[in-house]
Amino acid sequence: IITFTNVFAHINNLNEVLDCLKILVSRNTIIVIENHYLGSVINKNQFDTFYHEHPRSYSLTSFFKIAEKLNMSIKECSFPKRYGGNIRVILSNNFNKYKKPTKISDENKFYKKMLQMQKLITNWKMNKKREIFKLNKKYGPLPAKAFPGRAAILIKLLNFNNKNISAIYEKNNSKK
């Protein structure tokens, strides 16, 4: 059993990883991959998911192509609610092929929805800037809590600087 839990989005050279997996895979190998789901990212407007540490996002269609490259089949697929919406696929050589669910037909709309996302981002940006500027006017630069990689996207997108944020703090022993 080979598992990838929330790491597939971090892979820069997917073809190299797939080539290495081909070497490791035997007739009895099972590969379990879980990652954030492109459909959830789009439907929940999670545009901060797209940043330098996540060069890719995945759909069920993506995993059918990955399974094909590995000469494997998707045995099972589920959509855990973790992290705002994940996809988990189980690849194997020893099972009947997974029947493509109707959910995959929704993925045909992803491209159009991605194009519409820019309007949503522009509106979010305008509203968030207005909200923060109002707070800045009342309190001055604001302290912030935590700075995960995806926060860098938001700060850059909003073009914030020390006039908006005084400092960023992390709680001791904090996991978030």
List each language-model region with its residue ranges.
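Short secondary-structure boundary/capping segments
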Residues: 16, 46-50, 159-162
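Hydrophobic, well-ordered beta-alpha structural blocks that scaffold small-molecule cofactor pockets
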Residues: 95-176
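Short, glycine-/aromatic-enriched active-site segment of Class I SAM-dependent methyltransferases
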Residues: 33-56, 60-62
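A conserved beta-strand element that flanks and buttresses the S-adenosyl-L-methionine
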Residues: 3
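Conserved S-adenosyl-L-methionine
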Residues: 72-83
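Hydrophobic adenine-recognition pocket in adenosine-nucleotide-binding enzymes
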Residues: 7
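A short glycine-rich, Lys/Arg-flanked "PGG" loop and its adjoining helix->strand segment in the class I
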Residues: 15-32
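Short hydrophobic/aromatic beta-strand or adjacent loop that forms the aromatic wall/cage
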Residues: 84-89
